[in-house]
Amino acid sequence: MTIPYTPGRLDGKVALVTGSGRGIGAAIAIQLGRLGAKVVVNYANSAEHAEKVVAEIKAHGSDAVAFKADMRRVAETAKLFDDAVAHFGHLDIAVSNSGVVSFGHLKDVTEEEFDRVFSLNTRGQFFVAREAYRVLSEGGRIILTSSNTSKDFSVPRHSVYSGSKGAIDSFVRILSKDCGDKKITVNGVAPGGTVTDMFHAVSHHYIPNGEKFTAEERQQMAAHASPLHRNGFPEDIANVVGFLVSKEGEWVNGKVITLDGGAA
């Protein structure tokens, strides 16, 4: 007896999420698992965090595995995708989430800092998309991660990071054309301020004289930037990704969706 399809479900699908040991990436991996997908959890540093995500996905009734790979290294990216297919038999969804943040006035930015940011946020994501195209099943999904600072929200001393994410907007638009021959959609999400450990570490940069306020005060100020008067959380991003990679999300293609609760 064939089980009827439930809208929004990802049963039978396999997803890979880069940088999914914590924060937004972890929330995305867990959400895709809840929707029924088997998930490859990728991490670059902490196996402990990644294994916790794997355990949570399994607790919800799906399957998951953690693989270490640095998205700055294209050979490791390619091997990660090969390992994902070898482990689960196929791959349907690739979510590129790995990234680093950077702040600095133009006069102080070094070549090393520029390369550190662009090698992961921009170059790394491009080659994740390339490897995803290579192995994804027909009708697959690719999601890249931009930022609301790429075009909607201007922050002083944030040019390198914002520029690294602005390139993603162009990648999404053009790669959606390249991937059409395999019926693969390519979209992006552009989170605004989202409460994670990274948020608390850098939130003072986004608020004038932010160092004068406590982390809790800065979080409250960020909440009031949205007309909904609440903060964004990783689950808010994960819910949108869950839709974009579903059957129902197919007609959204080549688009970057800003997720900031209307703050920008």
From Swiss-Prot:
Keyword Plastid included in the entry's annotation: no
Active-site residues, record numbering mapped to chain: S146 (proton donor), S147 (proton donor), Y161 (proton acceptor), K165 (lowers pka of active site tyr)
Annotated NADP(+) binding sites: I24, D70, N97, R130, Y161, K165, T196
Keyword NADP applies: yes
Entry EC number(s): 1.3.1.-
GO molecular function: oxidoreductase activity, acting on CH-OH group of donors
Entry keyword set: NADP, Oxidoreductase
Source taxon at top rank: Eukaryota
InterPro entries: NAD(P)-bd_dom_sf, Sc_DH/Rdtase_CS, SDR_fam
A biological process from GO: secondary metabolite biosynthetic process
Pathway the protein contributes to: Secondary metabolite biosynthesis
PROSITE patterns assigned to the protein according to its UniProt record, in alphabetical order: ADH_SHORT
Class of the enzyme per the UniProt entry, highest EC level: oxidoreductase
PANTHER family: NADPH-DEPENDENT ALDEHYDE REDUCTASE-LIKE PROTEIN, CHLOROPLASTIC-RELATED, RE15974P
Similarity section: Belongs to the short-chain dehydrogenases/reductases (SDR) family.
Annotated function: Short chain dehydrogenase/reductase; part of the gene cluster that mediates the biosynthesis of the tetrahydroxanthone dimer neosartorin, which exhibits antibacterial activity. The two different monomeric units appear to be synthesized by the same set of enzymes, among which the Baeyer-Villiger monooxygenase nsrF is the key enzyme for the divergence of the biosynthetic routes. The pathway begins with the synthesis of atrochrysone thioester by the polyketide synthase nsrB.
Name the record gives this protein: Short chain dehydrogenase/reductase nsrJ
Organism: Aspergillus novofumigatus (strain IBT 16806)
